[in-house]
C-alpha cells in the first residue's frame, strides 16, 4: 500500500532540510493523503519550525493520530484543535467518496494528493529581502498547482496544464477564501508568528501558546483549501492528463 506513498513523502521532506540554520526562521507544513481505493485512505503530515518538528499527523482513516510535540497549547485548547483536524480529515474523505460515486467512470486509484505550505524569513544580512511564502500541491508526485502570494493567484505547476489543472485553477481563483484569506494567512499570520517567536523564543508562557493557536487555526483553513483542490482533481479524470 505504501510503496508509492512513502517515497513521495521522502521527496517532499528535503524542503525542511533547506530551513535556515536558525531554527526559528522558517515554518513548513506538509500533508499527504494516499487513497488506495474508495474505501482505504492513509494520511501523513507534519509541521516544522526550522529544524524543530512541532506536529505530526499519521494513520489510516478513522484512526489518525495527531500530536503536538511542543507544549505550546494547553490540553483544552489542543483538544479543540485536534478535533478540528479530525473533522477536516473526515470531510476530506467524504468529499472524495462523494465525487467517486458521482463520477465513478473518471476516478482512478491509487491516488496521492500532497500539500506543502509555509513561510521563511530572510537572513538578517539580506537587507530589503521579503519573506518567502508558498503553497504547492502535487498529484501522484507531479507538480499540480501552486499559489502566488503577491497577486493572490493560483497557477499551474506545469507549462502545459491539463484540463484537470485548468478546472482546478478556475475553482481556486474564483473565491476570496482560496485567494485573499490564504494570502493573509501566509503573508501575515505565518510571518508574524515567526517574528514573534524569534522575539519570545527564550520566554515561556501563554504568549507563545496564543500565537501558535492562531497559526494552527490558519493551518486548518489551509487544509480546507486542499479539499477545494481535490474537487478539481476528481471532477476531471482524477488528476490524469485529459
From Swiss-Prot:
How does it sit in the bilayer?
Single-pass type I membrane protein
Which N-terminal residues, if any, form the signal peptide? 1-17
Q: What is its main location?
A: membrane
Mark the transmembrane ranges.
Answer: 215-235
- Intrachain S-S bonds: 119-190, 223-236
Q: Which residues are glycosylated?
A: 46, 63, 140, 166, 176
The alphabetized UniProt keywords are:
Blood coagulation, Disulfide bond, Glycoprotein, Hemostasis, Membrane, Receptor, Signal, Transmembrane, Transmembrane helix
Give the domain of life. Answer: Eukaryota
Which ranges sit in the Cytoplasmic compartment? 236-242
The name this protein carries in UniProt is Endothelial protein C receptor
Q: What is the lineage of its organism?
A: Eukaryota, Metazoa, Chordata, Craniata, Vertebrata
What is the gene called? Procr
Amino acid at each position: 500500500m505504501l510503496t508509492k506513498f512513502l517515497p513521495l513523502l521522502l521527496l517532499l521532506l528535503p524542503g525542511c532540510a533547506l530551513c535556515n540554520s536558525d531554527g526559528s526562521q522558517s515554518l513548513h507544513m506538509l500533508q499527504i493523503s494516499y487513497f488506495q481505493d474508495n474505501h482505504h485512505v492513509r494520511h501523513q503530515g507534519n509541521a516544522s519550525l526550522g529544524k524543530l518538528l512541532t506536529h505530526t499527523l499519521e494513520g489510516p482513516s478513522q484512526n489518525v493520530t495527531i500530536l503536538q510535540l511542543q507544549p505550546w497549547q494547553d490540553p483544552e485548547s489542543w483538544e479543540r484543535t485536534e478535533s478540528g483536524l479530525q473533522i477536516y480529515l473526515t470531510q476530506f474523505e467524504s468529499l472524495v467518496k462523494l465525487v467517486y460515486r458521482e463520477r465513478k467512470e473518471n476516478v482512478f486509484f491509487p491516488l496521492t494528493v500532497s500539500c506543502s505550505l509555509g513561510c521563511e524569513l530572510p537572513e538578517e544580512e539580506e537587507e530589503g529581502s521579503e519573506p518567502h511564502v508558498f503553497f504547492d500541491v502535487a498529484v501522484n508526485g507531479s507538480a499540480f498547482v501552486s499559489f502566488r502570494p503577491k497577486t493572490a493567484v493560483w497557477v499551474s505547476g506545469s507549462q502545459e496544464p491539463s484540463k484537470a489543472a485548468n478546472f482546478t485553477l478556475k475553482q481556486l481563483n474564483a473565491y476570496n477564501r482560496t485567494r485573499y484569506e490564504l494570502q493573509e494567512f501566509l503573508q501575515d499570520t505565518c510571518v508574524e508568528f515567526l517574528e514573534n517567536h524569534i522575539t519570545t523564543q527564550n520566554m515561556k508562557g501563554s504568549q507563545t501558546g496564543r500565537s501558535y493557536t492562531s497559526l494552527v487555526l490558519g493551518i486548518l483553513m489551509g487544509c480546507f483549501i486542499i479539499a477545494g483542490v481535490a474537487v478539481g482533481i476528481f471532477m476531471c479524470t482524477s488528476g490524469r492528463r485529459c
